[in-house]
Amino acid sequence: MKTGALTTFLALCLPVTVFATTLRLSNEVDLLVLDGKKVSSSLLRGAESIELENGPHQLVFRVEKTIRLPGNEERLYISPPLVISFDTQLISQVNFQLPRLENEREASHFNAAPRLALLDGDAMPIPVKLDILAITSTAKVVDYEIETERYNKSAKRASLPQFATMMADDSTLLSDVSELDTVPPQSQTLTEQRLKYWFRLADPQTRHHFLQWAEKQPPS
């Protein structure tokens, strides 16, 4: 897709519905999957927030933070993938509140029994269900979307089965075809629909930065 066409395409992707919940992102949280869909890290890189509709949501993420080691050394701590489900029906803002993670002991405790909170815009706790996402694949590169689908079908603590059935074959993404869409090959269709989805969720500043980046890319 040429850059100019990509920019026009993304501009037309601006949401026509009004989102009611702002999820504030944290630089210590690596978001992997949202509501059964793999997160587009390139589009959301540097984003401060994403917009969500009211209702149930599920995040798969890792906590990443530099911790201290003996001898004044440091290392990057990366938690196991976590699943958290919550409902934003009456909530306008969601914020992460992470526990203290400064050293190996605290990191080990978090690995064994992770705990964190989601707070609303008034700093009040939001009811959540939190669990560790057990990885079943032995592949070097983990497909977190597939792992999340398996988790949601297994009736675990933070499972939301509706996201497993909706996202199993990208049927939701592919069904949202307007008169502006052509009928490209399947792989291109998936790429464009996923890009459209994440562009809709990104905050205005992130959209602007992404469009600026797209304008600078050479034609394919």
Swiss-Prot record:
Q: Which residues form the signal peptide?
A: 1-20
Q: Which gene specifies this protein's sequence?
A: yccT
Regarding protein family, the annotation reads: Belongs to the UPF0319 family.
InterPro entries named among the record's database cross-references? UPF0319
Source taxon at top rank: Bacteria
Q: Which organism is it from?
A: Salmonella newport (strain SL254)
Pfam families to which the protein is assigned, alphabetical: DUF2057
In Swiss-Prot or TrEMBL terms, this protein is called UPF0319 protein YccT
Its keywords, alphabetically, are:
Signal
